[in-house]
């Protein structure tokens, strides 16, 4: 079944609410035979949609699946590019790994890889990312920006802004950014962002943005070593959160910010990022591969590099683990 027809069929059911829609009306709306309509509905049932069929009345949608699915993500997605080419799998080793393979095979910009569970999810510096089934968002987005190599770190900050805005739009939850790639709620990590690049000499071939979000986890779902430092959107709101809705809003915000970035450069993103960032103007400790530095965070420069005012002068921090206070 073509994904566009599946999306259109779900939209028809949603518009009808609790009312039945005749097979002929669906057939006319989708431009296919009534036999094809039946086949399309059977495909939806396989995805977990509960569809009631009554002779001489037609069909109506009783219940959507509780699990994440390609159809749920596609339905209501208002982007033009981001996520329109979508690969969804229930279980995957790593969305980032699959996205790299797709990028190598000329997948178009905006291609999104989403999984309900990762068996080998990873974060920055090859750290393990705990990504269990049924509770989180694990996705990777392929970009093909025409920018110099040295500007690719800016896309991590752009992604962070889009995630903050998308979460607030989808769930009404305000979050903070901790440089460079963590999103926090009340000081606890909720989102991690991993940016990787494929390049040839001085040319960017693709940028892969990996985003992991703790959505519906409760305290007992986290390993003991994470319970005190991690949280989820559901824990913050006290409610179960629609994962597909969060994905849709993040993609829409990302598309808008990415368009701004490609048209107007990094300055609009920089201003937004600093408005959401924790620790600007306060002291922090930056642990880098070349040593640990302590000082006052002045903000980020025009390349997205953290500026730390230390006793020895202003230090540029390109990559580090940050400890606030």
Swiss-Prot record:
InterPro entries for this protein: aa-tRNA-synth_II/BPL/LPL, Bifunct_BirA, Biotin_CoA_COase_ligase, Biotin_operon_repress_HTH, BPL_C, BPL_LPL_catalytic, HTH_11, Transcriptional_repressor_C
EC identifiers of the protein: 6.3.4.15
GO cellular component: cytoplasm
Alphabetic keyword roster: ATP-binding, Biotin, DNA-binding, Ligase, Nucleotide-binding, Repressor, Transcription, Transcription regulation
Record carries keyword Transcription regulation: yes
UniProt record, GO biological process: protein modification process; regulation of DNA-templated transcription
Ranges of residues in domain BPL/LPL catalytic: 74-262
One of the record's GO molecular function terms: DNA binding
Pfam families: BPL_C, BPL_LplA_LipB, HTH_11
Record's signal peptide: none
Catalysed transformations (reactions): biotin + L-lysyl-[protein] + ATP = N(6)-biotinyl-L-lysyl-[protein] + AMP + diphosphate + H(+)
DNA-binding region, residue intervals: 23-42
Chain sites annotated for binding biotin: 118, 122-124, 189
Family: Belongs to the biotin--protein ligase family.
Function: Acts both as a biotin--[acetyl-CoA-carboxylase] ligase and a repressor.
PANTHER family with a match to the protein in the record: BIOTIN PROTEIN LIGASE (PTHR12835), BIOTIN--PROTEIN LIGASE (PTHR12835:SF5)
Name the UniProt record assigns to this protein: Bifunctional ligase/repressor BirA
Species assigned in the record: Bacillus spizizenii (strain ATCC 23059 / NRRL B-14472 / W23)
Lineage of the organism: Bacteria, Bacillati, Bacillota, Bacilli, Bacillales
UniProt gene name: birA
């Amino acid at each position: 079944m073509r994904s566009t027809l599946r999306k259109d069929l779900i939209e028809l059911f949603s518009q009808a609410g609790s009312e039945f829609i005749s097979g002929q009306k669906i057939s006319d709306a989708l431009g296919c035979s009534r036999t094809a309509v039946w086949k399309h509905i059977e495909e939806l049932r396989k995805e977990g949609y509960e569809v009631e069929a009554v002779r001489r009345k037609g069909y109506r949608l009783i219940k959507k699946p509780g699990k994440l699915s390609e159809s749920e993500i596609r339905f209501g997605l208002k982007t033009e590019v981001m996520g329109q080419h979508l690969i969804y799998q229930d279980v995957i080793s790593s969305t980032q790994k699959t996205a790299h393979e797709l990028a190598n095979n000329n997948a178009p910009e905006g291609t999104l890889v989403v999984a309900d569970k990762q068996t080998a999810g990873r974060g920055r510096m090859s750290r393990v990312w705990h990504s269990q089934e049924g509770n989180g968002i694990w996705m990777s987005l392929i970009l093909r920006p025409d920018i110099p190599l040295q500007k690719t770190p800016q896309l991590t900050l752009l992604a962070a802004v889009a995630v903050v805005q998308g979460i607030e739009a989808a769930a009404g939850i305000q979050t903070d950014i901790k440089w460079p790639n963590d999103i926090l709620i009340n000081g606890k990590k909720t989102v991690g962002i991993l940016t990787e690049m494929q390049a040839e000499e001085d040319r960017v071939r693709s940028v892969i943005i990996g985003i992991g979000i703790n959505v519906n986890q409760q305290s007992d779902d986290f390993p003991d070593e994470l319970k005190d430092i991690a949280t989820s959107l559901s824990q913050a709101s006290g409610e179960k959160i629609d994962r597909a809705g969060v994905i849709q809003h993040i993609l829409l915000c990302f598309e808008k910010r990415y368009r701004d970035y490609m048209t107007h450069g990094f300055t609009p993103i920089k201003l937004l990022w600093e408005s959401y960032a924790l620790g600007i103007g306060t002291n922090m400790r930056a642990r880098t591969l070349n040593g640990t530095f302590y000082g006052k965070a002045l903000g980020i420069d025009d390349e997205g590099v953290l500026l730390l005012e230390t006793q020895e002068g202003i230090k540029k921090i390109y990559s580090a683990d940050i400890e606030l206070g």
